Amino acid sequence: MVSLTSYAFVSMMLFSIGAIGVIARKNIFVIYMSIEMMLNGINLFLITFARYHFNIDPQIITVMVISIAAAEAAIFLSVIILLFRSKKSLNTDVFTSLTQGEN
């Protein structure tokens, strides 16, 4: 059986890689994928905690996080499509103005 620290280390690494991706990348889609990686790291830790401490509450929270992430994915991807149609780029440097009149 794999130890609790091994799962905690993997979940910490997933979260850290996702956080670095959010901070360092300029592509909106890559930032979105990094956010999803961070959520998966959190979910892995919650499931590990539930398994080793025989508690069902973290599993319920994980199911809620997964369902919220699915709704977030639908909204975020539609926003990405609209931004790409308007600016023809997914680079965050292009999106400096919030007004519609400016290109």
UniProtKB/Swiss-Prot annotation:
GO (cellular component) term, any one = NADH dehydrogenase complex
* Regions that span the bilayer: 4-24, 28-48, 64-84
Answer whether the UniProt record assigns the keyword Iron-sulfur to this protein: no
Question: Where is this gene product found?
Answer: Cell inner membrane
Which molecular function terms from Gene Ontology are attached? NADH:ubiquinone reductase (non-electrogenic) activity; quinone binding
How does the UniProt record describe the way this protein sits in the membrane? Multi-pass membrane protein
Q: What catalytic activity is recorded?
A: a quinone + NADH + 5 H(+)(in) = a quinol + NAD(+) + 4 H(+)(out)
Q: Specify where it is mainly localized.
A: membrane
EC class of this enzyme?
translocase
Q: PANTHER family in the record, alphabetically?
A: NADH-UBIQUINONE OXIDOREDUCTASE CHAIN 4L, NADH-UBIQUINONE OXIDOREDUCTASE SUBUNIT ND4L
What's the stated role of this polypeptide? NDH-1 shuttles electrons from NADH, via FMN and iron-sulfur (Fe-S) centers, to quinones in the respiratory chain. The immediate electron acceptor for the enzyme in this species is believed to be ubiquinone. Couples the redox reaction to proton translocation (for every two electrons transferred, four hydrogen ions are translocated across the cytoplasmic membrane), and thus conserves the redox energy in a proton gradient.
Subunit field text: NDH-1 is composed of 14 different subunits. Subunits NuoA, H, J, K, L, M, N constitute the membrane sector of the complex.
The protein's matches in NCBIfam families, at most eight in alphabetical order, are given as: PRK05715.1-2 (NF004320)
- Supply the name of the protein: NADH-quinone oxidoreductase subunit K
What is the source species? Answer: Aliarcobacter butzleri (strain RM4018) (Arcobacter butzleri)
Its gene is nuoK
